[in-house]
Amino acid sequence: MAHKKAGGSSRNGRDSAGRRLGVKKFGSEAVVAGNIIVRQRGTKFYPGSNVGMGKDHTLFALEDGVVRFHTGKQARKYVSVDAMAEAAE
């Protein structure tokens, strides 16, 4: 007869790697066209002027300039790039 009871296997023990989301370029930081400004799930931030949105809701600069965060209607948070001559040089 066995003196040890068979141990049950745990269903835990897995964890996925973090997705590296968040703001990559902060307010008044200089950006060049194509720079990623925010990586997000859903639209926590909406694209303003000179900012595009990818299919995974990533916001990126369409022009060279300086990043600006502001609120719009319905308390939505927007990210814009204010184009400036020689901003990111």
UniProtKB/Swiss-Prot annotation:
Keywords: Ribonucleoprotein, Ribosomal protein
GO biological process: translation
Signal sequence bounds: none
UniProt xrefs under InterPro entries: Ribosomal_bL27 (IPR001684), Ribosomal_bL27_CS (IPR018261)
Region called Disordered, residue ranges: 1-21
Cellular component terms (Gene Ontology): ribonucleoprotein complex; ribosome
A GO MF label: structural constituent of ribosome
Similarity comment text for this entry: Belongs to the bacterial ribosomal protein bL27 family.
NCBIfam families per the UniProt record, alphabetical: L27
Protein name: Large ribosomal subunit protein bL27
Organism: Erythrobacter litoralis (strain HTCC2594)
Chain's gene name: rpmA
